[in-house]
Amino acid sequence: MDKEVQVVENGDIIEKDNVLMLTKPYMFEGTEYTEVDLSGLDNIKARDMIEAEKIYGRSGGFSFIPEMSMEYAFVIATRASKYPIEFFQGLPPRDAMRVKNKVTNFFFGMA
């Protein structure tokens, strides 16, 4: 069964479930992407979050709330998608923030 499509207030960004439409086409390793499928967020487990925190810590990151950091969110996004972390690291700033916010909002029950 299809879930509802959401139109964000400015009218130009449409999302379906946990599929994030990019603000402009993004080239990664010779392929053009117009969306990021984060539907795997529904399958994330606490052990994935623990592992993401370890990866975040080993990279030198520190935060009292690591779930709010972009790097942590990208580790989770990698686990929730078919994309490598380099895919997320290469996103334009606006789309990178939208991915981070999507993951963060998912954790805190706002997605």
Where are each of the predicted segments found?
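Short, surface-exposed, charged amphipathic helix/loop patches that serve as local interaction elements
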Residues: 2-111
